[in-house]
């Protein structure tokens, strides 16, 4: 049986005043028109996904569709407005800042829209570079 590595359930990120209260007042499922009429900016709306151990995930979509925001919510670089995010069965919304730093350093990797590769390295060597910096044996 495959083990879930990260699970996101009903993740929301709204920008505006007291977005948690707004979601609660609409039973956690306002439609897009209601969100916009109320003056909120929806960055992520009710996103759910599951990534199993050993899987590689690529989020693709139009510019401004919420891909980077969702990944930042998954790693808690920004706080989601609502929803559940579990990593290895642990609730990331309850994790301390220290636990999050360790997670980001050792267990979760991300490549965002604006990145640079080392031109003198192969693609594989670029991908392995963070492990090399940490002293992990690549054999």
Region annotations inferred by a language model:
Residues 83-91:
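Conserved ABC transporter NBD signature motif
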Residues 75:
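Helix-to-loop junction immediately C-terminal to a conserved catalytic motif
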Residues 34-41, 92-109, 133, 138:
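ABC ATPase NBD coupling module
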Residues 60-62:
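The feature captures the beta-strand-to-loop junction immediately N-terminal to the Walker
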Residues 124-132:
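Short helical segment in ABC ATPase nucleotide-binding domains corresponding to the A-loop/adjacent helical element
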Residues 1-40:
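ABC-family P-loop ATPase nucleotide-binding domain
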């Amino acid at each position: 049986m495959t083990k879930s590595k990260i699970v996101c359930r009903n993740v929301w990120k709204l920008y505006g005043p007291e977005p948690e209260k707004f979601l609660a007042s609409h039973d956690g499922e306002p439609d897009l028109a209601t969100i916009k009429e109320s003056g909120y900016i929806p960055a992520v709306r009710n996103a759910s996904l599951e990534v199993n151990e050993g899987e590689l995930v690529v989020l693709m979509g139009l510019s401004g569709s919420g891909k980077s925001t969702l990944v930042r919510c998954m790693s808690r670089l920004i706080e989601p407005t609502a929803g559940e995010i579990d990593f290895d069965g642990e609730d990331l919304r309850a994790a301390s800042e220290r636990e999050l730093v360790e997670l980001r350093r050792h267990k979760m990797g991300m490549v965002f829209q604006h990145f640079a590769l080392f031109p003198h390295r192969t693609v594989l060597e670029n991908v392995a570079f963070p492990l090399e910096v940490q002293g992990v044996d690549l054999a």
